[in-house]
Amino acid sequence: MLIKQGDRLINTRNWSELVKPDQISRASESADTMYGKFVCEPLERGYGTTIGNAMRRVLLASLQGAAFVAVKISGVQHEFTTIPGVLEDVTDIVLNLKQVRLAMDTEEPQHLELHVNKSGEVKAGDIKCNQHVMVLNADQHLMTLTEDVELTFELEVRMGKGYVPADMHEGLSDEIGLIALDASFSPVRKVAYTVEQARVGQMTNYDKLILEVWTDGSISPEDAIAYSAKIIKDQISVFINFDERISEQENEGRSSASDVNENLFKGIDELELSVRATNCLKSANISLVGELVQKSEGEMLKTKNFGRKSLDEIRRVLGEMSLDFGMKVDGFEKKYQEWLKRKQQNEA
């Protein structure tokens, strides 16, 4: 469609005719809130790699997280020394502190304290936190005291993003004994993505993006990908040099029941399906094709007595009508009623 904006013609078909994913589905449900596997399909050919690579970079480098930025140890003037009664040297203790994962609910720097006076292993859980900071990996080893030694650690926590070297922290005190730390703020520990073929109707030359995200527990994988997508959207929107709202208004209301694939209005009984598949759909209260295509494959497989064989059978029948699972049909009930009314008028 060509839309006039000022003295320019905007061709909305440049984006309106591209295949777009209807939703992101979580492929792996787990009690582990630090891992998520997500599937995004269908995408235009090549878009899986484009989007996957962009999401991976932003996930790893651009999300806010908390980390220690400095430590002061009683009686220690620099990190290249040892502490009597402590098995590890200060350098090793500093390395262990960098492995502590934190969650913080304020943007203001926070100061924590660790006080020890008895022999034995000291863990991250021994750090005294306040109401704004929480240690996520309490079992992280910090050091081992070989005898009863009294030590006090003063720790500064900040919010930030990405990786910041020790000499790049702003506003740290230059007092003797304060050891600046390299800080890895990113709450995302690892990201992996793969691209597979996706099917739309009879066509299989589309992309399926599978994105795996591991976090430190301070943020859920779902929120991590949502924030990353928002960052990318905000960064690239500056390239759009026309008013998107006008094209949306021009297209508003143009869609009606006559524009929709009328196979959506067919009853399940009209499809050439096995008795088993038909009964499974009816038991799930699915009576129309339009209701069926809005279900994801994962949702269907959770239906009682519904297996992979029935799924493949239904997918084949839907494909013959240029339909598939996971489709988004806005206002289906209204469109169905319009179609039904028009059909009754034609038959009268």
Swiss-Prot record:
The keyword ATP-binding does not apply. The gene is rpoA. GO terms for cellular component: cytoplasm; DNA-directed RNA polymerase complex. Belongs to the RNA polymerase alpha chain family. The N-terminal domain is essential for RNAP assembly and basal transcription, whereas the C-terminal domain is involved in interaction with transcriptional regulators and with upstream promoter elements. GO terms for biological process: DNA-templated transcription. It comes from Oleidesulfovibrio alaskensis (strain ATCC BAA-1058 / DSM 17464 / G20) (Desulfovibrio alaskensis). Residues 1-243 are annotated as: Alpha N-terminal domain (alpha-NTD). Its EC number is 2.7.7.6. Homodimer. The RNAP catalytic core consists of 2 alpha, 1 beta, 1 beta' and 1 omega subunit. When a sigma factor is associated with the core the holoenzyme is formed, which can initiate transcription. GO terms for molecular function: DNA binding; DNA-directed RNA polymerase activity; protein dimerization activity. Pfam families: RNA_pol_A_bac, RNA_pol_A_CTD, RNA_pol_L. SMART domains: RPOLD. This is DNA-directed RNA polymerase subunit alpha.
